[in-house]
Amino acid sequence: MALAGAASAPIPATATNTDAYRAAAASGATGGVTGRIYEESTRPKTPDQPLNGATVVVLPKSADIVQKLEEIKRTARNSADDYRAAGPSIIALRRAYEKELWDSGAVDLVKSTTADADGHFTVADLPAGDWLLIATHSVKIDKHAAAGPPKQRGVYAPKTHLTGYQRVTIWLREVTVEKGRSENIDLTDRGAWFSAVVEERAPDASR
């Protein structure tokens, strides 16, 4: 099974100079990021709903990556097709940037974790500097809940059929980490950077 659009070529990322991060780590100038991911309560006296299992990825800040992410978000407003392509494109761009960091030998600067049952997360031992936090939370939704007109379906993955959808909430934050400090971040559904609907597809049966 594949996410529609995920197979398309991601927008190339521009490698980030990691020398400052390595120097900070070598000198012991490290800090961290903690936070909580949750849905805000819509009723008085009703507790917030933690989004356990949300994925949190922290990467060295790249102005190039931020610009490209914002461009995908802006383009998503152009049409229904662009909106459906946005979620897979955002994920593909993040993964391409992770791979560039790994390939450059900076695998230790790619940090990831998941939110616990209460929605809390912690990313420790980050060298002091500017970082980019990208968090995602996916919920499987009914196959027909987000379906468009038949002519709009399957435009990204020929010879496949739709098996379902994921509603993906995405948070994008720029964080400055300082020595000996832990930056606290609350990520709520209302404060999400982008909400995507990602198609799940499987290959058509061969005849």
Predicted regions located by residue number:
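Long luminal/extracellular ectodomains of secretory-pathway precursor proteins
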Residues: 9-207
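Bacterial N-terminal signal peptides
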Residues: 1-5
